Amino acid sequence: MMKELIAMFMTLCCSLVLSSCNIPSARRRFFTYPMKEILNDTFSEFIHHLNQHDAQAMLAMFSASAGEEQPLLLDEVDAMIAHFPDPVTITEAASGIGQSSSTTNGENRTKGIGNFSIESNGVRYYVFLSICTEDSANKEEVGIIELSIISVDNYHDSTLFGGDPERKKGINILE
């Protein structure tokens, strides 16, 4: 009985300490914006722009460094619009969520990854999304870093997760 009371007291104390946390980034990360919601919102917005064939809005969602590493990012966005002339629907929300947060020399960085399933014109696709939500040392890194897509028929584990040499920052249509 005493152990249970101590455990309840410790849980209450930890909850109070965390809820009174004065560090906005800690509060944001742990209480307001779970990575799954951020990934789902980002991907939903991207698919909305894709369905509207709004290349500029899609391009604006990528980190500036993705554009620097892939100077033809606008061409990749146009290729994606051409690849999906019909409406795209999200058939599976973010799964396989990963998040990394780090602080180096007082600089904070938070990245997230997730997998989605979409469908267009009767064809199903898997999508890998990598985003940066915070980088106080390099603001240009914030945004979509990589979006890789492959049809379910052509999928194998090494394509999206095995470091395919064809993948790069930006958009990768792996067909």
Regions found by a protein language model. Name each.
Residues 34, 70-80, 125-131, 144-147:
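Generic hydrophobic, helix-prone segments enriched in Leu/Val/Ile
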Residues 22-25, 56-118:
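Short solvent-exposed beta->alpha transition segments
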Residues 1-19:
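Sec-dependent bacterial lipoprotein signal peptides
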Residues 21-52:
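Short, low-complexity N-terminal intrinsically disordered segments enriched in polar/charged residues
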Residues 13, 50, 135-137:
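Structural motif
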Residues 99-175:
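Exposed beta-sheet edge and beta->alpha loop/turn motif
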